[in-house]
């Protein structure tokens, strides 16, 4: 079974952080939080899930902050989430299955990112994002805004999805 470090960058996310972390607490092996200057209860909430909380001065560059978060990871793979992302129950199960069966030669796992919903909560817009990235494989985030990792090596398209929920359901 592979191990996974959750690597997050946060700032003033007290309204959504707990929901996010609760949805993945039993799935990941390590939680890394890089705080870029919160002035609310974000840090306090994060301490209920991890003691690996690092300050990083904001540099107008999301990739710099994400790379900082990944630099603290010690597990086989790094996973990123934004504080307003969640794993739904069916995706939690699919993720655990992936952890048990993933071929360790896979460098990047792409996962659907559900970001648009109709009035009934059904997904209306989804696209694949690099979600699990092999740790220390030489890949890094690029782009000050709309940052990405260019997949290198073996890429797997997964069954688990990440759901973007701006506010509490």
Enumerate the language-model features and the residues they cover.
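N-proximal low-complexity "stem/linker" segments adjacent to membrane-targeting elements
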Residues: 1-23
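Catalytic-site signature of metal-activated, phosphate-bearing donor transferases
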Residues: 3, 64-70, 76, 87-169
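A conserved acidic beta->alpha catalytic loop
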Residues: 23, 27, 35-47, 58, ...
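Conserved donor nucleotide-binding strand/loop of the catalytic core
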Residues: 44-72
């Amino acid at each position: 079974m592979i191990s996974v470090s959750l690597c997050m960058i946060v700032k003033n996310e007290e309204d959504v952080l707990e929901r996010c972390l609760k949805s993945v607490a039993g799935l990941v092996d390590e939680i890394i939080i890089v705080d870029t200057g919160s002035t609310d209860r974000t840090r306090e909430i994060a301490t209920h899930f991890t003691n690996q909380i690092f300050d990083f001065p904001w540099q107008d560059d999301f990739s710099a902050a994400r790379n900082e978060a990944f630099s603290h990871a010690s597990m086989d793979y790094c996973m990123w989430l934004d504080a307003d992302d969640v794993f739904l129950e069916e995706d939690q199960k699919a993720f655990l299955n992936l952890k048990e069966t993933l071929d360790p030669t896979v460098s990047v796992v792409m996962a659907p990112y559900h970001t648009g919903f109709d009035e009934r909560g059904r997904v209306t817009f989804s696209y694949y994002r690099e979600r699990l990235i092999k740790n220390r494989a030489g890949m890094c985030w690029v782009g000050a805004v709309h940052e990405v990792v260019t997949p290198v090596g073996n890429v797997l398209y997964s069954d688990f999805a990440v759901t973007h929920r701006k506010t509490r359901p």
